[in-house]
Amino acid sequence: AYYPFEKQGAGWDFSRYDIAFFQHLEKRVAQLGALGIEADIILFHPYDRWGYAKMQHEEDYAYLRYVVARLAAYRHVWWSLANEYDFMLKDKPMEVWDHFFEIVQENDPYDHLRSIHNGNVTMNYDHTKPGVTHVCVQNWDVKRMREWRAAYGKPVIDDECEYEGNILRNWGNITARELVHRYWICIVYGGYAGHGETYEHPEDILWWSKGGVLVGESWPRLKFLRGIVEEGPAEGIEPFAGSFPWGRTAGGGRGNYRLI
């Protein structure tokens, strides 16, 4: 197992970074690049049994500068400031998250894409802030895509519109058809969506968290949908305005091109 910091007694020395961990991380990032896959690097998350989510602010700032210095040279890297940042607000209040964006932007000479992911659907970050390049939301209600586009004026990704799978959690047991339907709504409303699978596995290997082999039925359908989108205008499409029928029926277009 690799850990980002060196051990110090029973705990960690947050001022000393484990070189082997970051060499391994760089290897994996490079492998994704070789496959033509964008690497959205999650910098913080609340699901932590090592104490990393509760570092002091100055330790957080130093860590960010170090990670950006190591990974910014990879052209396919994006920065996700956090997975479900709002679950860490007790230890990292909003002004700290704002400063995190500033640090990443100031230390990345290549100005990679930057965003942040909410947990509670009512806790979207203020994506109008200048350090945010695109909007990331977690929300099952993909029909709000037009609302988010209008509110933030930036590209929108619903990167957790729930998962195809069969686990007990309600966010991880929608059907393949439902996930593809949500993708369709996101795309025709002028946005993007994230894909994942959460099928039970005898060795508890969920693709959602550990990768591996996709076993579901949504990914080939999404491949077909991608083909439809790529056959359309290179500039993309704009969602149709108005509440009826386009509040209930996803539709968009550009010029004489229509998707409904």
What is each stretch, according to the model?
Residues A39-D40, V156, A193-G194:
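Hydrophobic beta-strand scaffold residues
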Residues Q31, W148, I185:
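Hydrophobic/aromatic ligand-binding patch that stacks against planar heteroaromatic rings
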Residues Y47-Y52, N83-F87, H112, N118-H127, ...:
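Active-site clefts of carbohydrate-active enzymes
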Residues H57, K90, R169-N173, V215:
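Hydrophobic alpha-helical scaffolding
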Residues A34-G36, G153, G190:
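Glycine-centered short loops/turns at secondary-structure junctions
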Residues A69, E106, R149-A150, V188:
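Solvent-exposed polar/charged
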Residues G165-N166, L179-I260:
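Aromatic- and carboxylate-lined catalytic core of secreted/periplasmic carbohydrate-active enzymes
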Residues A1-R144:
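Active-site mouth of glycoside hydrolases
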